[in-house]
Amino acid sequence: MKTSLLRMIAAGALLAAAGSLLHADEAHPPATATTRVLPITHLWADAQGVSHFRDEKLSFEAATPENPTAGTTSRTNPDPEALVSLPLRGATGATFLYLKRAAVEDWHRAPRRMYLIAVQGMSEVTAGDGQVRRFGLGSIVLMDDLTGKGHITRAVGDVDPIALTIPVPAAPH
């Protein structure tokens, strides 16, 4: 029973993330055949330990001799770039994160560098520099504020927020 529930939640997470791209706002337009990018938010800490938000994009580029670590392409479609799989290199230990409705997590750092994908509800995050952003269904955040005082997380709205977290290796220095 527990395994089937987790599978159902995982499938829902993938569908939610994919579906949200169809309804993305203008600041984060969906990936298209023209843009081939996926917008994400990067929450990071500067040398003084103050966290900040930065908008970034994951590029769906096929591997080439010059860039052998890029994504893999379709082997069955006549157009090999009709499907490009972008691996999250080194990602193991994915978990679901639950936050009770109206809960507030005071100043804290990300426990490790990880992608966080919202699959239900909405959270409001305050960075160390005071900027506040809301993340709802399908939002992707690279949690990378591992030093300093971190950030505040609040559950907002009428639905308990749930997110899928995917740990990734530390950024190269």
Model regions: which residues?
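Short, conserved beta-strand element in jelly-roll/cupin
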Residues: 98-101, 109-125
